[in-house]
Every structure is written in structure tokens, then in C-alpha cells.
Regions:
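Flexible, glycine-rich terminal cap/loop adjacent to redox cofactors
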Residues: 9-13, 19, 25-37, 49, ...
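FAD-binding beta-loop-beta segment adjacent to the flavin cofactor pocket
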Residues: 144, 288-302, 383-396, 400
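Glycine-rich flavin
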Residues: 3-6, 22-29, 34-169, 202-206, ...
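FAD-site-proximal beta/loop scaffold in flavoenzymes
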Residues: 153-170, 257-333
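A Rossmann-like FAD-binding core segment of flavoenzymes
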Residues: 74-75, 110-113, 117-125, 193-294, ...
Length: 465
């Protein structure tokens, strides 16, 4: 076996690995990419793309059912799940060529498909072939973490890796885990016609989000028929005929049985480290993944980590992209630079969407005391939302005493598109006074940001006249 030598090897064909490989090749480096399964990663095959496609189907189903409010008679809306899932597959098929081995080989990347195993800190073995590089990037991502619930394996269950291949629409869907993945899929199936229960161990819904915004979203999900069991533990599962019975223990210790046609486990993620041979090179890991510093360097010179595999990192596709670009700078150029995580937005793609950047109101009060400002605008009062018949929501901006943006929170249709404005404000230290002076086109939902910012200006001049 004769080694093939590269400047850079990316292990993993998800976002971090793909950006590293394409970027490195574009800079003129000799690059290899190793992927043991399908290129495109979790986002394309089991996450962002299929879930958003299914949510689009579900939103359309809801719109059809409520079309009479707009003077449109549609009759009974029937969901054909096989056709809905075929739409999901078509969306994936349109995007997949961008991440394909053929495209990357065309970019000049050596693509090796198989399990990568570290031989030493500069060498990997893949299907009997040895690849050597000055720098290696671990970007193997994560997989669903399945809790040790007695009877679960025998009962059968879905994760985000299998739910998009479900054969029939469940009459009742039980979702264990009330985070973004579980909640998005819960709403999708509820709108498609399933009765949905969410079983969440934490006593508060979306505990990491702003409490006011999360409470508003929960109200809307409950109004759509989703049933929440908060502070509840899934104790054991069993099969009764074609149904799954889940025994759930509430916070007060009382146990109840929930029966469903399908069970979805959405309780978090675990790092994909098995089989890499990290012990051969003594890369430090923990339960969260590969330990790396702000410059994405592991404890072993020349070995980096990027994307969801990084322990303690924010597990978002856009963060994986930023990490990969930082690795390229640090691995291929003199000097080094850290990733700036001070203004990272994220979105939960329910309807309405929940978008967030920076500190919550509670976090801001803990750090800055009572001098903070909180400026709100109800989405339902915005002209465009009224015209669209959109759902209620809220724009909430948290500022320091000078009016600089510390955090922004939006519950609205298109919140994911709107949060960029508040992210820029945070990134560059803008004040809400400056935001209030930005001309926004009328009528748009984004006017709510300007109107929220104007609340501080009004409060400043209140009583002057």
C-alpha cells in the first residue's frame, strides 16, 4: 500500500467536510474527502432538507383546510402520504448533485468512499488505501441518540433517519423529545392529520429560548392539537398488536399510558467517532465529541475538528460552514484565527418560525442587570401580517443601556429571513435607534423590527412635549 499525499484531508461528507474540501481545492490545495455513506450529510438526507420539504407539505395542507376564510371553496383536503414523501425525495434529488462525488471530483478533490481509520496523525487508511496529509479535519457529524428505555428496541421506533420513509400516516404519533427536531416533525404530522403527543423531560418547553417567545409558540402548537407532556419521563415501551404503548411518568410521579401507531425518538445527538481509530493518535474526546479550541485545533498538531462533531459546539449547518472556513485559514495559511460565536442566529422552522440571536431577556438581566431595555412589537398588529391572515407572534429586541442590541427574538412567518437584520446589528454594535432609522419597504413583516426599535426612541422622548 503506497500512501497518497495531500495538503488536506476532510473526513466526513457533511457540510463541514464539503466546505473544507471545496474551499481547499478552490485555493489550489491538494485535497481528499472521505465519506463512509452518502455525501451531503445529515442535513441533506435526514435533517434540514427533508424536514423543511415535509413542513412545506404540511403547511399547504393547513392552508387548503382554511382556504374558506379567503373565499375559496376547496372541499375536503386529503393527504396522500406516499405522494407527500415522494415530494420530499424529489427535493433531495434536486439538491444532491451539488454534494455528489462527481461534482467534487470535478473540483479536483480525491473522493474516497469508505470508513477512515487513523494510522498515525498524518495518515488514514480507507478500504486498504493509505492517504497522508499535513492536515486532517475530522468532520464526521452526529447521529440520533436513543435513550435506554426498556422495551424500546423490541417495540420499534423511528428517528429522523427513518421517519421520512414511514409507510403510513399514523393516527397517533408519540414524540419523545420536545426540542427543535421533535417539535418541527410533531407539527408536520399534526397538520397532515395525526394526533400528536410530545413527551419532554424538561419542565419548560424550549428552555434555551426566550421564555416569552417559547410560551407563545407553545400556545399556537396546542391550538393545533399537539399535546405536551412536560417534565415527563418515558419509562418503558411495549407492543400491543399494531400499536405502541409508552408508559410515561409525570413530574408528580404518576404514571400514565400513551398509545400510538408510531413512535419518534428525538432526544438529542451523539458524536460519530466509532471506528475512526482516534485512540491510535490520542485525540482528546469526551461525551460531546472531539475536543477542539476556538481555532478548531485538537490536542494533536495538524488534526482539526469542524461541524457537529466538535464537543460543545453549536450544532447548526451554518455554524459548520463557518467552522470549515476557519479550518481552511488555520490549516493552509500562516497565523491562526478563532471562530467568532458572538452573533450566531438559529431558527426552529415551525409555523410560525422561531428565530433567535444573542441573549434572551433573562440572560441579559443576569449579565447586565436592570439597565437593559426590552422592546416589543406584536406581529399580529403589522399590516402585512393582517393582510396575509398570518399567525400571531412577536418581535422582541433586548438592548444594553445605550441601546445596543444584545439579543433578538422573533416568532413570525419568515422569522428565519428576518433575524439576519438583528444579527447584523449585534455583529457590528448597532443600536435600536439606528435600526429605527432604516427605511423598510411597506408592507412587509420585517417592518415589525423597525417598529420594535422605535419603541425605545419613543420612550426616550416621552414627556418632552
Amino acid at each position: 500500500m503506497h500512501p497518497t499525499t495531500f495538503d488536506l484531508i476532510a473526513v466526513g461528507g457533511g457540510t463541514a467536510g464539503l466546505v473544507t474540501a471545496a474551499g481547499g481545492a478552490g485555493l489550489g490545495a491538494k485535497v481528499a474527502l472521505v465519506e463512509r455513506h452518502r455525501m451531503g450529510g445529515e442535513c441533506l438526507w435526514n435533517g434540514c432538507v427533508p424536514s423543511k420539504a415535509l413542513l412545506a407539505v404540511a403547511k399547504t395542507a393547513k392552508m387548503v383546510r382554511h382556504a374558506r376564510a379567503f373565499g375559496i371553496e376547496t372541499g375536503n383536503a386529503r393527504v396522500h402520504l406516499n405522494e407527500a414523501l415522494a415530494h420530499v425525495k424529489r427535493v433531495q434529488a434536486r439538491i444532491a448533485p451539488h454534494d455528489s462525488p462527481e461534482r467534487f471530483r470535478g473540483l479536483g478533490v480525491h473522493v474516497a468512499q469508505g470508513q477512515a481509520v487513523f494510522v498515525d496523525r498524518h495518515t488514514l487508511e480507507v478500504n486498504g488505501e493509505r492517504l497522508t496529509a499535513r492536515n486532517i479535519v475530522i468532520a464526521t457529524g452526529t447521529s440520533p441518540a436513543v435513550p435506554p428505555i426498556p422495551g424500546l428496541a423490541e417495540t420499534g421506533f423511528h428517528t429522523n433517519e427513518t421517519i421520512f420513509d414511514i409507510a403510513e400516516l399514523p393516527t397517533t404519533l408519540l414524540v419523545v423529545g420536545g426540542g427543535p427536531i421533535g417539535t418541527e416533525l410533531a407539527q408536520a404530522f399534526a397538520r397532515l392529520g395525526s394526533t400528536v403527543h410530545i413527551i419532554e423531560a424538561l419542565p419548560v418547553f424550549f428552555a434555551r429560548e426566550d421564555a416569552e417567545i417559547a410560551a407563545l409558540l407553545r400556545e399556537q402548537l396546542e391550538a393545533e392539537g399537539i399535546r405536551f407532556h412536560l417534565g415527563a419521563q418515558a419509562m418503558r415501551a411495549r407492543r400491543e398488536g399494531s400499536s405502541t404503548v409508552l408508559v410515561v411518568r409525570a413530574a408528580d410521579g404518576q404514571e400514565t399510558e400513551l398509545t400510538g401507531d408510531a413512535l419518534l425518538i428525538a432526544t438529542g445527538r451523539r458524536p460519530n467517532m466509532d471506528g475512526l481509530g482516534l485512540e491510535h493518535v490520542r485525540v482528546v474526546t469526551d461525551r460531546g465529541g472531539v475536543v477542539a479550541d476556538a481555532r478548531l485545533r485538537t490536542n494533536i498538531p495538524g488534526i482539526y475538528a469542524a461541524g457537529d462533531i466538535v464537543s460543545g459546539g453549536l450544532k447548526f449547518t451554518h455554524v459548520a460552514d463557518v467552522m470549515a472556513r476557519a479550518v481552511l485559514r488555520n490549516a493552509l495559511f500562516p497565523g491562526s484565527s478563532a471562530v467568532d460565536y458572538s452573533a450566531v442566529p438559529w431558527v426552529t422552522y415551525t409555523d410560525p418560525e422561531l428565530a433567535r440571536v444573542g441573549l434572551t431577556e433573562h440572560e441579559a438581566r443576569e449579565r447586565h442587570g436592570s439597565s437593559i431595555g426590552v422592546w416589543r412589537r406584536e406581529i399580529g398588529a403589522v399590516d402585512r401580517v393582517i393582510a396575509d391572515g398570518g399567525p400571531p407572534g412577536l418581535v422582541k429586541i433586548v438592548t444594553d443601556r445605550r441601546g445596543r442590541v444584545l439579543g433578538g427574538h422573533i416568532l413570525s412567518a419568515h422569522a428565519g429571513d428576518m433575524i439576519g437584520e438583528l444579527t447584523i446589528a449585534m455583529k457590528f454594535g448597532l443600536t435600536v435607534g439606528q435600526l429605527s432609522g432604516v427605511i423598510h419597504p411597506y408592507p412587509t413583516t420585517a417592518e415589525a423590527i423597525k417598529q420594535a426599535a422605535e419603541q425605545r426612541v419613543k420612550s426616550t422622548f416621552a414627556g418632552w412635549m
